[in-house]
Curated annotation (Swiss-Prot):
It comes from Marinobacter nauticus (strain ATCC 700491 / DSM 11845 / VT8). The RecF protein is involved in DNA metabolism; it is required for DNA replication and normal SOS inducibility. RecF binds preferentially to single-stranded, linear DNA. It also seems to bind ATP. The keyword DNA repair applies. Keywords: ATP-binding, Cytoplasm, DNA damage, DNA repair, DNA replication, DNA-binding, Nucleotide-binding, SOS response. Pfam families: SMC_N. ATP binds at residues 30-37. This is DNA replication and repair protein RecF. InterPro entries: DNA-binding_RecF, DNA-binding_RecF_CS, P-loop_NTPase, RecF/RecN/SMC_N, RecF_2. One of its GO terms (cellular component) is cytoplasm. It is found in: Cytoplasm.
Length: 373
């Protein structure tokens, strides 16, 4: 699905006029504070149900207001059966921060879960913070993998929620001064069964991702390609049943007061020469690696017939021309939708040297208003 129309109300400084976008590339430029990043943020809000910049919903509501609305029209690019009209969907989210109420709609019908919006509009953000996928802790890489797992395997979301609930119960018991071992084993059994199922799904999707990543990596002419190793760690050594691991480390978990083994400790381990790439790779190499990982994500979904909307915020500040060209070329090959922001007026010829410039729309953003050029 491509976002072909966006309309917001009381979202930061954006004006409420509807804007139509290209299903291919959209180039937005403007001075700092003009609202160009807010456009990406609104698109992300529509697909993620939250801001990718801040954690508080109040922060994105326009000054003096208590409620925001983001609406989008999506185009699959496909024709409906027995019709010459394209398949379109309309999705929207309204959030009243004073009443703490959220309304979600898909094609005019109320839905209860943000997952319905996310399934219609898979959004992948590439901004300065994304490079923490390599340099940051395991949680960043779990989040990266689980985004893909969610869009590949429909059962993942409910299974993950069950794991979270059981983990919370175990943690409460571990923090209890007097531990009931018989009851703890009951929770261990539930946790172990759910963890095995969840890890099976993660492992399957990871292997699909790894194949896509290696195909993208093979096109890169860099000396470190051969020595790079990527593996999935499920959160414990699966040669031993998780329930046994939990019993063997009961005192350790009790001292720490929370669950130390299982899917909440999963990681994508990236190593070069036997050491973590966060310790061995330069900042530039880490950026290249993250870009390739993001492209591989998009490739997995593209191979499944799903289109990702990529949001590239101020990449000129983080990526040199070579990296920008590599990213633009790969995204063009995926035939996905892309939004790119910059301070300077974009020059498409610098991204597509060979003259194979894709369809695009260009917008100047000033005081929250988008003007197409």
């Amino acid at each position: 699905m491509a976002l072909v129309k966006l309309q917001t109300q009381h979202f930061r400084n954006l004006l409420s006029a509807p804007v139509e976008f290209s299903p291919s590339f959209n180039l937005l430029y403007g001075a700092n504070g003009s609202g160009k990043t807010s456009v990406l943020e609104a698109i992300g809000y529509l697909g993620l149900g939250r801001s990718f910049r801040v954690s508080r919903h109040q922060a994105v509501v326009a000054h003096g207001q208590s409620k925001l609305t983001v609406f989008g029209a999506l185009d699959s690019g496909l024709l409906a059966q027995e019709s010459s009209e394209k398949v379109e969907h309309r999705i929207g989210i309204s959030r009243d921060v004073s009443l703490k109420e959220t309304q979600l709609r898909v094609d005019g019908e109320a839905v209860r879960s943000l997952s319905f919006l996310a399934m219609h509009l898979p959004v992948s953000v590439i901004d300065p913070g994304v490079f923490d996928i390599v340099a940051g802790g395991p949680g960043k890489r779990r989040q990266f993998l689980d985004w893909l797992v969610f869009h590949v395997e429909p059962s993942f979301s409910s299974l993950w929620q069950q794991v979270q609930r059981v983990t919370s119960q175990r943690n409460q018991m571990l923090r209890n001064g007097r531990l009931d071992e018989s009851l703890m084993r009951v929770w261990d059994s539930q946790y172990g069964a759910l963890a095995e199922s969840l890890s099976d799904i993660r492992e399957t999707v990871f292997q699909r991702f790894k194949i896509a990543f290696e195909s993208v990596l093979a096109e890169l002419d860099a000396p470190w390609v051969e020595g790079l190793k990527m593996d999935f760690y499920p959160g414990w050594d699966r040669s031993t049943a998780l329930t046994e691991v939990l019993v063997n480390h009961r005192e350790q978990e009790r001292r720490m007061g929370h669950t130390l083994y299982g899917p909440n400790r999963a990681d994508i381990r990236l190593k070069f020469g036997g050491r973590p790439v966060a310790e061995t790779f330069s900042r530039g190499q880490q950026k290249t690696l993250v870009i390739l990982m993001k492209i591989a994500q998009g490739k997995v979904l593209s191979d499944l017939g799903k289109q990702v909307t990529f949001l590239l915020d101020d990449i000129n500040a983080e990526l040199d021309v070579r990296h920008r060209v590599m990213l633009a070329r790969n995204l063009q090959e995926l035939r996905c939708q892309v939004f790119i922001t910059s301070i300077e007026h974009p020059e498409p010829d610098t991204l597509w040297h060979d003259g194979d410039t894709p369809e695009y729309r260009m917008f100047h953003v000033e005081h929250g208003q988008l003007t197409e050029e």
